[in-house]
């Protein structure tokens, strides 16, 4: 039996990962391929002094990466997803993973290991790299057009293998997927390069939200002070956490949706009056809002939900409605009973998150921060009434 081990962050899994798996299996006529998301980022520089960048470079929780891999591979034959490396308490090293699967399936089989040519260049930095070469055959996917052996003219390499410390490395040259998870997150172009069902999962759970918030809250913002730009993102993060904490009390099944609504609720808060009205006028027929809206300052809730749905493929109406209603919760509903638990939680979290201040944002704020965990309806009504009085 021929078994291929495919290790990596898979954060997020994209079409190139799936194409690599298929091509590797075809190359060696493999019987089984196992995806193994890792529990640690090796060789990645992390700036812990920049909180936003640090949060962006953290690995997405393993259960989400496993779920996305299972979605992306659900129709593929002889391809499995394993959480072996995720379960390791310490850093999971390739040599340990190889030994584990040889114990499971037996050492008499042929084992292969997929890597990119960028990793091959620093392979001697890997733990027990010489043992790895003895235990498995390497399938190397070439990145770029430069010959790994440094012997072919650039852009014309056709090497199928080469000798690496007396071990044959199988080379894949005709791989034409120029995709990376980081580039997808930077552009937040999630409508191409990944399985549509994976996109739905990402949106449903609010994954990679900081990249999208940064794109809109910073790129479109005219503040010169980076602190003020980042403050908006941090407000969204605090609201998201409070939404999660509240939903943990009121409906644990909706915790992910609570996070998603909280993290994205102010995605277009950066738009000024001219930009908000221009967006409104351009999409008026889709927004279903009359021209008599109370103030341009409340438009960001409707515009944000519209942006998420039309540009980024969000489908969950529970999340989208909560975002729409977080400034004017009673617009477009007939009575209080139509408001969802998520609507009320997002509204309260936005007004009561830890950085909101007494008198300026909400009177008796500590009282309401406690009350909202005990009686959501009472807290919502009283906070809403106070906010309405403040606007008069």
Swiss-Prot record:
Q: Which family does it belong to?
A: In the N-terminal section; belongs to the NadD family. In the C-terminal section; belongs to the Ap4A hydrolase YqeK family.
Q: Which reaction does it catalyse?
A: nicotinate beta-D-ribonucleotide + ATP + H(+) = deamido-NAD(+) + diphosphate; P(1),P(4)-bis(5'-adenosyl) tetraphosphate + H2O = 2 ADP + 2 H(+)
Q: In UniProt terms, what function does this protein have?
A: Catalyzes the reversible adenylation of nicotinate mononucleotide (NaMN) to nicotinic acid adenine dinucleotide (NaAD).
Q: Which domain of life is it from?
A: Bacteria
| Region entry Ap4A hydrolase, spans | 230-392
Name the chain's protein. Probable nicotinate-nucleotide adenylyltransferase/Ap4A hydrolase
Which residues take part in binding Fe cation?
235, 265-266, 350
GO molecular function list: ATP binding; bis(5'-nucleosyl)-tetraphosphatase (symmetrical) activity; metal ion binding; nicotinate-nucleotide adenylyltransferase activity
Q: Which pathway does this chain act in?
A: Cofactor biosynthesis; NAD(+) biosynthesis; deamido-NAD(+) from nicotinate D-ribonucleotide: step 1/1
Q: Where is the region NaMN adenylyltransferase?
A: 1-210
Please give the coiled-coil regions recorded for this protein: none
SUPFAM superfamilies tied to this protein: HD-domain/PDEase-like, Nucleotidylyl transferase
Where in this chain does the record put each HD domain? 232-355
PANTHER family per UniProt: NICOTINATE-NUCLEOTIDE ADENYLYLTRANSFERASE-RELATED, PHOSPHOPANTETHEINE ADENYLYLTRANSFERASE
Gene Ontology biological process terms, A to Z:
NAD biosynthetic process
Recorded source organism is: Ureaplasma parvum serovar 3 (strain ATCC 700970)
Q: Which UniProt keywords apply?
A: ATP-binding, Hydrolase, Iron, Metal-binding, Multifunctional enzyme, NAD, Nucleotide-binding, Nucleotidyltransferase, Pyridine nucleotide biosynthesis, Transferase
| Residues annotated for ADP binding in this entry | 235, 266-269, 300, 326-327, 350, 356
The EC number of this protein is 2.7.7.18, 3.6.1.41
The record's annotation in NCBIfam families points to:
bis(5'-nucleosyl)-tetraphosphatase (symmetrical) YqeK, cyt_tran_rel, nicotinate (nicotinamide) nucleotide adenylyltransferase, PRK07152.1
